[in-house]
Amino acid sequence: LADADDGFKYVLKFRGAGQREKALIAELLGGEIARTLGLKVPELVFAQLDSAFGRSEGDEEIQDLLKGSQGLNLALHFLSGSINYDPVAMSTDPYLASQIVWLDMFITNVDRTFRNTNMLIWNRDLWLIDHGASFLFQHAWVNWKKNAEGPFPIIKNHVLLPIASELEAVN
């Protein structure tokens, strides 16, 4: 979480982390496809990370992450006061659930499960976050076309699948 020059707080997605630029591209594409479909996604912005950012950080691993992320990164507008979506405690409209499952099948998002829903409740609305693990085919370029066009069996683990009864209507 970082304060930006525009006075807002953002959740930074570091270029130097994990899958590096691929995850940021997936985050941007997945989030904007969701937004285009009418789903709620926090504002995505490009964030310039100055070389002085985190210089006083004592943890060497975090220092390495920050050094590897100097320059252009991606950030999501922080939804202050939001809470994690809990499928046990909260009800979701079946049509909305179907839209989200359809989106995650389309972008092959493996990361919206019961353990980690990657959804927030903010101002009584459901918001989607964290699309960095989307576009699964990008992680295995051998047979990429077959992988991109083939079935997506991991969708069986989707947190909203049990209530997504309107998939035909959404499709």
Task: Show the residue positions of the predicted features.
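C-terminal catalytic region of ATP-dependent kinase domains
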Residues: 122-171
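Conserved ATP-binding subdomain of kinase catalytic cores across diverse folds
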Residues: 1-88, 97-110, 117, 122-127, ...
